[in-house]
Amino acid sequence: MNRRKKYKIFILCCLALDLMTMAWLGYRYLDRQIPDELQISRGETVSVSALLDHPLVSFEEAIEVSADGSYTLPCKILGYIPFKSIKVTPVEDKSVYVSGSTVGIYLRTRGVLVVDTGEIQSQSGETEEPSKGIVKPGDYILSMNEEQIKDKKELIRDLDELDGTQVQLELNREGEILPVSVTPVKDSKGAYKLGLWVRDDTQGIGTLTYVDEQGKYGALGHGISDVDTAGLLDIQEGTLYKAQILAVSRGSRGNPGELAGMIRYDNSNVLGSIQENCKKGIYGQMDLSEAQKLSLVKMPVAHKQEIEIGPALIRCSVDGQVKEYEAQIKRIDLNHEDSNKSFILQVTDEELLEKTGGVVQGMLVGYNKDKRGKTQYLQGLT
């Protein structure tokens, strides 16, 4: 094969690769613009093409939403290339009381969280690591020798009773229950150790997003993860407290900043219980009498396809009082892999920029749906 022919083949391969890359990038772009799921108001005739207007993608003209359940809506590229099916779910219109108040958070893990394994100086002077390769950071110890372990105190108590024989641990590893065996090591002081760093609780402050009429609330807009393992905490229970802002760590490029405050852990400051910790935030039940004392404004909950580029409001407390600050939604992503990254927001309010440097962790974001000053807030997003 002569050089000219090889060169032609090389050029054709490069062109084919370019076309494949362009097609893949185009598919990725459309996939991010068109969501996999939609929620729409029950009993309403909705033009999907109006909700998800895109020149390259076609949908059925309208669907009648009833109480019968969800619909699967096929869509095509250029009218004939199958693209994806959108799950359309009818939901009741809902209003909630949006807040922006600062709250204190205390969580107890379900079992004892393993932060890391560690070395032990044995009585013989040797360095041993009995749990290495058996127990992993992020595991939860649920029981030892068939005795349930609820917290560090129970684990330490049971360790004090060890006699050096092998112990049986029941672990929760990413949702899978695993039985493992570890042989403890007697340290230089004569105590038996497993060589584990553990944690059973965490605390902090954040922003209360909303409360509904039954006292069910959502807060933070992101899950609470362990600072060492970076894993989402599996919680047994938690308590929501009143909190006081003491300082604001200013945000900067690459650093979101944060609100710093004080929590008084006594019954007079309890606002409610924390029942769930997930990627979208923490959820639970609030005492309605306590909720009524907070700064709350009743607002309708919007669907994600109703978000528009343009003016938005950030509702938060950075100096002890809930206020609204101006911002701009710059870009919208209806189908991002991370459900907490639905849009890009730019703070434009000079007062907030002066106080915080921009968005800091723990702020509630809303947007102006009808352009006439009636703000709608996005449930669970901060």
Describe every region a protein language model picked out.
Residues K8-L25:
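Hydrophobic membrane-insertion alpha-helices, especially the h-region
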Residues P130-K153, K369-K371, T382:
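Conserved PDZ fold ligand-binding element
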Residues D93-E128, N172, I177-V185:
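Signal peptide-directed extracytoplasmic domains
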Residues I77, I86, P90-D93, I156-G195:
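PDZ-domain C-terminal substructure recognizer with occasional recognition of PDZ-binding tails
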Residues D68-T72, G164-Q166, I307-I309:
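Extracellular Ig-like/FN3 beta-sandwich strand-entry sites
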Residues E147-D158, P179, K323-E326, G373:
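Short, Lys/Arg- and Gly-enriched loop/turn segments at beta-strand edges
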Residues L25-L78, V88:
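Beta-strand-enriched, solvent-exposed domains that form extended recognition/catalytic surfaces
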Residues V185-L381:
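Serine endopeptidase catalytic core focused on the charge-relay Asp
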